[in-house]
Curated annotation (Swiss-Prot):
This is Putative protein CLUHP3. It comes from Homo sapiens (Human). Residues 14-47 are annotated as: Disordered.
């Protein structure tokens, strides 16, 4: 589940019997225990988002992760450096995306990054796929179409 800085407050609802509650966010697909709720390391820093992976498998408990866009940029840059892909344009584009990232812009941002990555990999955008997210809001649940 992707959350912006203020959505965490909306998740603080009364817990039903049994110790688990349904996530109170549009388009959710997972359950979480109160101990699994994620909070940002610095509540005043709203450029990150929360990711909740529900029902990953019988042997793995659902988990939450707080992600910062700038860290994603560094990971993408390192991936291209490891594979010796030219990445100046991609790094510039993804740095801009990280600086302007919001939940409502996530699909548009992914589409832009996908175009940049695919042109570097000499693929058409239709050949690239979006990473799988097990639980997402209505804003991020649909795969962006080809450009």
């Amino acid at each position: 589940m992707f959350l912006n800085g203020n959505c965490l407050e909306t998740l603080k609802k009364k817990e039903p019997e049994g110790g688990r509650r349904r996530l109170s966010h549009p388009g959710n697909m997972g359950w979480m225990r109160p101990s699994q709720e994620t909070t940002p390391p610095d509540r005043s820093h709203h450029s990150g988002f929360g990711l909740f992976c529900g029902d990953p498998g019988p042997e793995i408990e659902p988990f939450s992760l707080w992600v910062f866009p700038q860290e994603m940029v560094l990971e993408i840059h390192q991936l291209f450096m490891d594979h010796e892909y030219p990445c100046h344009h991609i790094t510039s584009h993804c740095t801009w995306v990280a600086a302007h990232w919001t939940t409502s812009q996530s699909c548009a941002a992914w589409q832009g990054c996908r175009r940049a990555c695919c042109s570097t990999w000499w693929k058409s955008p239709a050949q690239c796929t979006r990473p799988t997210v097990m639980s997402a809001t209505f804003e991020t649940a649909q795969e962006p179409g080809p450009s």
